[in-house]
């Protein structure tokens, strides 16, 4: 007996894709995006940068190794929804403690499988990211489109996923003190800093500069996070007030915030960069790094003219800015994720560079 479709997604332009539900069976309006990673769905599910987004996985089989307690990037996943071609509800992995569907149901994340994910991804590629409704199969198309038109994607994503109080992560041997501004930080970033001898004090996204100064850091880190960087003017102002006072390192949203603090501008990409195989050229070494990426916005290259920033990395797929620096202020940032999780580790040296800059500052 053929199983009947019970869920569907509706795009703003009226396209419908039918499939089967897994995870939570609630209705949601999200921004639809795609990720080209073959593995790492648990890290994607728990990456705060995907807040309010429905992620379409281009790799067809998802769920086959289950969910492991030690592999979450944050304890409370905030992904909007997950769309896959084929879902495996019987994982084979000795580390697995739950199925993907069980975790999604626990956190209210709807999923749909059985759709033509290649066709859907081509639509996103050709027409860009846009709003999508994940709903019941019986929802009329007209009603679905009306919901899409009347529902805005919230702009409070960073405040939703940031910590609400100061937290500290200690290293075994503590040589440096890093204050990390949490805009939706992945825990592998904290682990990467701890591993290099950094005590990490994690502060909320809207912590003012004077409060950070009072913590007496050796360096400041600005994390990844969801949404439009212009939605966090408080964080931008904090960085403006700290430029030139401490070594500063930013990743992803943190990279965009640093650029805005120097007077540059950002813009939204047609469909973003999401995956574990994006080639980036390091302009200082002329080497190619394969990087993990997850972002909807990029720094406007022309807007860097007249600022103190210089470009250090570019994306080889579309020539967008992937890294900037200001040597006199001991500031640098990258658009991609050197901590991976998931993805390659070609760029882990950037954490070592941050250590070197803090050491130089301490010895000055």
Where are these regions (language model features)?
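Residues that mark the start of a beta-strand
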Residues: 175-179, 199, 247, 290, ...
